[in-house]
Amino acid sequence: PLIEDFNMKMFVSFIQADGYNPLSINGSTFEIEDKEYARNLVTELFGDDEEFQHIIGNHFTPGSIINTIANKKIKVDLTDDELFDKIFKYAKQNYEAHFAEGYWIDHWTYILDLVENYQAVYPDKMKEKLFLDKEFMYFDSPVYILPRDEKICLTKDNKIRRFGSLLHNDEEKVEKLDMNVYASNWLKDENENTIKTNLFGKLFVLATTKIANLDPYGLGLEMEADKPGWNDAMNGLPGLFGSGVSETIELKRVVTFLQNNFDSNYDIDVPIELVKFVEKLVNLLSQDTSDFVYWDKANTYKEIYRKEIRFYTLGNKSISMDLVKEALNLYAKKLDLAIEKAYEFGNGIYPTYLVYEVTKFEEILENGKAKIGNYGLPTVKALEFSMRLLPFYLEAPARALKVMDNPIEKRKMFEKIKASNIYDYDLKFYKTSEFLDQESNEIGRGRSFTKGWQERESNFLH
């Protein structure tokens, strides 16, 4: 209870306007925004010490203050508690993180757990936190997720793969915004105002960006940004147009939460560009289109949105709650169908990982020559895919138990899993997956592991 909303607010703020998040979370720093007060405070406590003027005039930590006092052998006529009371009286706490590498497809799935934990302890404060607290920010990484015509490429052995999905660093963005790539940066408008919203708005932005990530068969969420989920040993899947059903299931949880907590008496502010994105998706989802057409058009809308917010947003806009309600209903319908189809493809067990093969494509030309993408290979436009399931993993079925309403169906799936190669009858343990012997090393380093080692066919806690 003492934590209150700190963890929730910090991690929700780390979600970017594109739905992804930085990898490395750093310790918080503190800052005194009233610089004149900060200068006078340093003079009062430490005289005209220039080093302390620099430390307290910028982002600092308690450790940086104590260490400087110790290293310079400065005598202070206050206890540590008294000293910090003075310094932190007007200090603001800053969330700190940096991009580091890659965008994992499942980091955001833990956000709802934090929200539900807060709701369990403070149910009476949930409405206020969802709608009235408008201090949730958007992290901004020095990275750009490239469109398909930069990352779907033809390899030297004539295979179609998805490589080089990220522009890292996006040097144009770093220079234009004067970004510190090792510190926190936040989405701003043209006038350098930090963009903020409420919790409901942030979760709605998250849901919108993720619904546009459904794969060509409308089953899993695509590994479109160079990384898989927590199971890093499946690091080959992004190149194989891999997708995850676990994330589809978790997205349904988010959408259901938003539907259950929807209240038209409040409003939400979102980036102006997102409103257009939502309108396009609502129109698309209202049509009877094939899964491939949805994949193609949703990706196009998503790429336009990302391009529009690459450097900054034009500002916040209050989005119609009628539009939000309609969008959520359509998102839920699309996800219900995705989850139902995944269950059918798995014949009663939810598949965790899917991979796709491009079966029809056309070359992309630039000035009459093959366009070379970010990975240094010729790029192509995918026109048709075939899909196959990887051997069953335990993850998607385990997550599915959170959203399955029918206890009979839960029991059926449980019995099927226990009768499958996911269960080790000798050790009486569930394993991470079935046997991977028939898979190639291209799925990731997990295939090369000895059985039972780390993530391969092991009793593994993460």
Feature-to-residue mapping (PLM):
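Acidic, mature catalytic/reactive cores of soluble proteins
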Residues: P1-H462
